Amino acid sequence: MALNNSHDVRKRIKYTINITIYMQGGAFMSSTVKEIKEKTGYLKRSDLYTIGVGQAIGSGVLTLIGPAILLTGQSAWLAYVAACIWGFMMIAPIPWITSTLKLGGGFYSLVGDMAGKRVAGMYAVGFLPQTINLATYGVAIGMYANSLWPQINAKWFGIAALSVFFAINLCGVDVMAKVQKILVILLFVALGLFIVLGCLQLKNPVFEFTAPDFFSNGPSGFFSAIMLYVYSTNGYSCIMNYGKQAKEAHKDIPKALLYCIPTLMVVYGGVAIVASGVLPLDQVAGQPLTLVAKNILNPALFTVFMIGGPVLALSSSINSTISNNCIPVAQSCKDGWLPKSWAAQNRRGAYWKLMTFTYLMGILPVLLDFSISDVVNNIMLLASALAFLQIYAYFQLPKKHAEAWEKSPMHISNGKYYFLCCLSLFAYICIFINSCRSLKLPVVIISLIAIVVCMAYGWFRSVSPDVKMETSVWED
């Protein structure tokens, strides 16, 4: 069977691609914020690992494999493994950066330290729209709950889920991390059950590379499948946000990052093997994973899988996304790019105002039935612009922090490090070009205007006496 890779196929999966990519007031015056002594050095390597894996494994593992089979046939599993490698290429320098520096505000702190004040301002305001990614999870978790229990209203279930994890995150990062560990363990059990029972029922030649259906649409189809998958493969980079909270940041953060890569390759590859190996390809192509799950699991196990698979995958993503969105923004508030009062903390150290903002950004599109795919489309180029700022910052490490770089426990030669930076640049350029092919002219115009606004903001705001860049990057 040859699977069609026509324009219609690409159109069918466009919405899925957009959703997966981001599964993501007042006068600006100086104000006094009550200082809360932050708890530091309490996250273990296992905590960081589960935060990263839980963030990365979202709805993509359930929704993307069917469309990928349309694009590349039996090799959909291999494309997912390749996408995990591509996803690492996008952030390849980060393990080495985090072995050298502790970052208090994630990418914002890195860009501000390496690229300068004005670029930090551009990044600060450009990051805010990306908090819309929480809404994509709210929509998805409601959809899956409704498919399992039709009597449940998908919209209100999504809002309820966002509300529960908003409350958990208000209890502090330590509580969020404990909940995340439980969610990820249960998620592994559910996906492991699917993989093991599915592999026992394989019928298709999933490992015959020369089979006609293995690369059904040739190299272009295989590459398209990688691009479809790739945004579900590097969410674990959020671990870098927790430099202050990690017990041994220089050792634990880079290792936790690296541990996530083989984990995702095994989980994603295993699920995709089962998805393409049990039923005929023409039955599963373009279909969600639940179709296969119903065929290999009895009703009781299917219910367990639906709760432990898609629902918990999205729950772990929601749980970590709230804090991940707040930490960089909080640092930009402390530096004066945004109102400093926004960085207020409760007694548990949670940035409650920013979490409320993130929560509202998550529930309002769900509540008002906004087209999230349209919103995501309109900020796609802005997100790409921020990614290129990150890459510029990567290249500055050996010069900006030469002594700390030499002492890094993961030190490599400058040539090898710059090679990793070039890999990241190459990976992002390919994704940027691939994304631009699907963008319409109005979206491009809106995105370019947004980029210009961010640049202008960084330039003019940088001269304000209220902007005082705090130290949020430490060498020891």
What are these regions (language model features)?
Residues 67-70, 89-170, 310-331, 371-386:
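Hydrophobic transmembrane alpha-helices that form the core helical bundles
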Residues 47, 81-82, 123, 148-175, ...:
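Transmembrane alpha-helical segments of multi-pass small-molecule transport proteins
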Residues 142-145, 154-204, 216-217, 234, ...:
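Membrane-interface loop-to-helix entry segments
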Residues 35-40, 77, 150-153, 182-303:
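Helix-loop-helix junctions that connect adjacent transmembrane segments
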Residues 15-75, 87-88, 92, 104, ...:
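Membrane-interface "cap" regions at the ends of multi-pass membrane proteins
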